[in-house]
Amino acid sequence: MTIYGDMDTSIIKEKPKGRKDIITKVVKEKDLREVLLKVLEEIKLGHQVYVVAPMIEESEESTLKNVELLREKFDLAYHGKIPMGVLHGKMKKDQKEEVMHDFKIGKSKILISTTVVEVGVDVSLATVMIIFNADRFGLATLHQLRGRVGRSDLQSYCYLICNEDKERLHVLEESNDGFYISEKDFDFRGEGDLFGVKQSGDMSFSLADIRRDYD
């Protein structure tokens, strides 16, 4: 956008007709039970659920959740009675397509995945997004992931699971507006280097303000 700043842009601030704001909540892992109950409630209504983890496999050097661990956790919580799918970037193309097809047609009710579902996935009956270790993702990524639900007139929910109370995560509780979220992200991260590769940090201008003086 900096390089092509002289180009005309279109700004769309309205949701498609009938879409509702996604109710978003930051939840500590010790309070996960309320989320699991909500998942069960939504599935009984015929709806579906995304669960996102930052890792594919368990690592001795990391306490981050992974898709395999979460598959076991959710399978145990629901006594193996809810059909689930697992999706991640190491799977072969035909495997990924099969998992997504099963989820789209409702054969699986919970899809446990890495961020490969961030864009390009449209399942209108998906009404719950649960993101583990949410503090490890940027606001833009979290907003994109949240956008996988709320794709119909059904009320949808997003739960950000995080053991530490991170101020920036509450921005997503406050708003569904991508423009507002990007501005808050700008405030947290700084403007970075306009003429280099640094994407965060303060440029330390004495007078200029990038947002105020962009024209």
Spans of model-derived segments:
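P-loop NTPase nucleotide-binding module
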Residues: M1-T2, T115
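C-terminal helicase module of SF1/SF2 nucleic-acid helicases/translocases
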Residues: L32-H47, E68-D215
